[in-house]
């Protein structure tokens, strides 16, 4: 079947609505919408929930940009895209909870298509979701990965292991030699066997995120915590910032190609701290995190 960008856009808009409704239902606070236009073509809807009871900040962004030609930075690696008009659309979200016992989560799903008269379109899907705990709970990690595996199973037994490994490899801070969190799923350049199959998988990932994350939020949101836990949460959020600004391809691409800065940096935590040569107390729950986030088979 010929790729249908309009169908993908309809799903993405519905997904943004659904995710905002579900997150608001947990927190009680509303999302504030900021609709924006891109000078070169397209625009989006950025929605942010701030200073809620459960979520210190949650951002759910939809964007749909298009143009007559790809930026040089994009065609350098993919010469087949030169001279083509393009459309890129997606939903991305990051949730930074207030309670340190609730993990931070990130998800995105996206679609890209480039066309020119007389030639087949070049298109692909990408996306995934990943979890960044501050205090590790095995039952949460198992639930997260089981949900990821179960949504992958209808598409083949090999899908979950492949995209789990890609996620582990991608969300790695080389300068710290540590994982960002416990991973999940990550896929890109997905265009086989056909459009319908790939679109169905992207929808499964987009819809599966809430099933993976919200039960963990409900389980941990009322856990008592104090200054020590909050201190550690803010310190570990520094790793999130480091990854996004140093290693994340999407962030770097957006900033280098004149993307909308406010939307790109919506993933940043509202508060964060660094501490020179911080060492957690041996044997403490804080010290246990480095072992917990090591790559492993959670299932």
Curated annotation (Swiss-Prot):
Molecular function terms in GO for this entry? coproporphyrinogen oxidase activity; metal ion binding; protein homodimerization activity
Tell me which family the UniProt entry assigns to this protein. Belongs to the aerobic coproporphyrinogen-III oxidase family.
InterPro entries per UniProt = Coprogen_oxidase_aer, Coprogen_oxidase_aer_sf, Coprogen_oxidase_CS
Subunit text: Homodimer.
Catalytic residues (positions): 106 (proton donor)
Gene Ontology CC annotation, any one: cytoplasm
Question: Its catalytic activity?
Answer: coproporphyrinogen III + O2 + 2 H(+) = protoporphyrinogen IX + 2 CO2 + 2 H2O
Alphabetically, which GO biological process terms does the record hold? protoporphyrinogen IX biosynthetic process
Cross-referenced PROSITE patterns, in alphabetical order? COPROGEN_OXIDASE (PS01021)
- Give the function comment from the record: Involved in the heme biosynthesis. Catalyzes the aerobic oxidative decarboxylation of propionate groups of rings A and B of coproporphyrinogen-III to yield the vinyl groups in protoporphyrinogen-IX.
Major localisation: cytoplasm
Ranges for the region named Important for dimerization are 240-275
Q: Which organism's genome codes for this protein?
A: Klebsiella pneumoniae subsp. pneumoniae (strain ATCC 700721 / MGH 78578)
State the compartments where it is located. Answer: Cytoplasm
UniProt keyword annotations, A-Z: Cytoplasm, Heme biosynthesis, Metal-binding, Oxidoreductase, Porphyrin biosynthesis
Give the cofactors, semicolon-separated.
a divalent metal cation
Q: What is this protein called?
A: Oxygen-dependent coproporphyrinogen-III oxidase
The pathway noted for it is: Porphyrin-containing compound metabolism; protoporphyrin-IX biosynthesis; protoporphyrinogen-IX from coproporphyrinogen-III (O2 route): step 1/1
């Amino acid at each position: 079947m010929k790729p249908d960008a309009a169908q993908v856009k309809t799903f993405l808009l519905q997904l943004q609505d659904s995710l905002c409704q579900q997150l608001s239902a947990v927190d009680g606070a509303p999302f504030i919408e900021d609709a924006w236009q891109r000078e070169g073509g397209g625009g989006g809807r950025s929605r942010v929930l701030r200073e809620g009871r459960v979520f210190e900040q949650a951002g759910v962004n939809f964007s749909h940009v298009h143009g007559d030609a790809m930026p040089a930075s994009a065609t350098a690696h993919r010469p087949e895209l030169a001279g083509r008009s393009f459309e890129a659309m997606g939903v991305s979200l990051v949730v930074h909870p207030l309670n340190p016992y609730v993990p931070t989560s990130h998800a995105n799903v996206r679609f890209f298509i480039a066309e020119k008269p007389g030639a087949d379109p070049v298109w692909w899907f990408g996306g995934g979701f990943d979890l960044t705990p501050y205090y590790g709970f095995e039952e949460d990690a198992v639930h997260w990965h089981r949900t990821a595996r179960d949504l992958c199973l209808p598409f083949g037994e090999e899908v979950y292991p492949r995209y789990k490994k890609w996620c582990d490899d991608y969300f790695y801070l080389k300068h710290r030699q540590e994982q960002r969190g416990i991973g999940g799923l990550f896929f890109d350049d997905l265009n086989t066997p056909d459009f319908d199959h790939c679109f169905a998988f992207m929808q499964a990932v987009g819809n599966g995120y809430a099933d993976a994350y919200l039960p963990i939020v409900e389980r941990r949101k009322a856990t008592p915590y104090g200054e020590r836990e909050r201190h550690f949460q803010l310190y570990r959020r520094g790793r999130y910032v480091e990854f996004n600004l140093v290693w994340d391809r999407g962030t770097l691409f957006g900033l280098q190609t004149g993307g909308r800065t406010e939307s790109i940096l919506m993933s940043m935590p509202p508060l964060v701290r660094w501490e020179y040569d911080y060492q957690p107390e041996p044997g403490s729950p804080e010290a246990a995190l480095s072992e917990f986030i090591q790559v492993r088979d959670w299932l």
